[in-house]
Amino acid sequence: MVSFLRLAVACFAAVGALAAPVESLEERSDELFNSTLHEFAERSTPSSTGWSNGYYYSFWTDGGGSVTYTNGAAGQYSVQWSNVGNFVGGKGWNPGSARTINYGGSFNPSGNGYLAVYGWTTNPLVEYYVVESYGTYNPGSGGTYKGTVNSDGGTYNIYTATRYNAPSIIGTATFTQYWSVRTSKRTGGTVTMANHFNAWASHGMNLGTHNYQIVATEGYQSSGSSSITVY
């Protein structure tokens, strides 16, 4: 990004070369370069976690592309992203549990993205998803199929996968992923987590001590927007 911006600055400077001395052009180049970097930095929200209006939130990004995460009132949040590497963010609870979750809103990915109940446990270290909608890529296609579970008016396919030396809540680690992927996409409704936890357990997919649990938007090498409210 830096080399591209400097090239753009140089091109801009060349246009006015006949009308300005060299010192003035250098000053203008530095000002434009620094201003552009500042504007780029303002467009990207840094990774963070915490509490917002009674709900726990988590936002993580690998720093690629531009992504803006905004906490709204109560359980609402929004995300705008463009040409990202990878990010995941949303609102919910800490710790997670076998609760019944209600949510609604809009989810508009252009490319690869997920709208899911997303959480972690430790001992064992597990990253889990109950995917309600997704973009161009079905996340379950990269895992091992285990079966189905019927819940909340829909059918979910169950998968498991292993991530090696990947980012986690305890740092870079190797861990297991559990997935329930809804066969009919939706962007609002009820998710009965107990149904998924019980179905996973029936396939030997056991959870540990719950960490956070959020209704998350995730984007991977894509662009898009979402606005979600958790109840």
UniProtKB/Swiss-Prot annotation:
GO biological process: xylan catabolic process
InterPro entries listed in its UniProt record: ConA-like_dom_sf (IPR013320), GH11/12 (IPR013319), GH11_AS_1 (IPR018208), GH11_AS_2 (IPR033119), GH11_dom (IPR033123), Glyco_hydro_11 (IPR001137)
Signal peptide: 1-19
Entries under Gene3D superfamilies matching the protein: 2.60.120.180
Annotated glycosylation sites: 34
Primary location class: secreted
Keywords assigned by UniProt, alphabetized: Carbohydrate metabolism, Glycoprotein, Glycosidase, Hydrolase, Polysaccharide degradation, Secreted, Signal, Xylan degradation
Pfam family, one: Glyco_hydro_11
Annotated ranges, domain GH11: 43-231
Keyword Signal: yes
Active site: residue positions: 127, 218
Entry GO MF terms: endo-1,4-beta-xylanase activity
Reaction catalysis annotation: Endohydrolysis of (1->4)-beta-D-xylosidic linkages in xylans
Pathway connected to this protein: Glycan degradation; xylan degradation
Cellular component aspect of the GO annotation: extracellular region
EC number: 3.2.1.8
Entry's localization field: Secreted
UniProt xrefs under PANTHER family: ENDO-1,4-BETA-XYLANASE A-RELATED
Family affiliation: Belongs to the glycosyl hydrolase 11 (cellulase G) family.
Function as written in the Swiss-Prot or TrEMBL entry: Endo-1,4-beta-xylanase involved in the hydrolysis of xylan, a major structural heterogeneous polysaccharide found in plant biomass representing the second most abundant polysaccharide in the biosphere, after cellulose.
Name of this chain's protein: Probable endo-1,4-beta-xylanase A
Protein source organism: Aspergillus terreus (strain NIH 2624 / FGSC A1156)
Gene behind the chain: xlnA
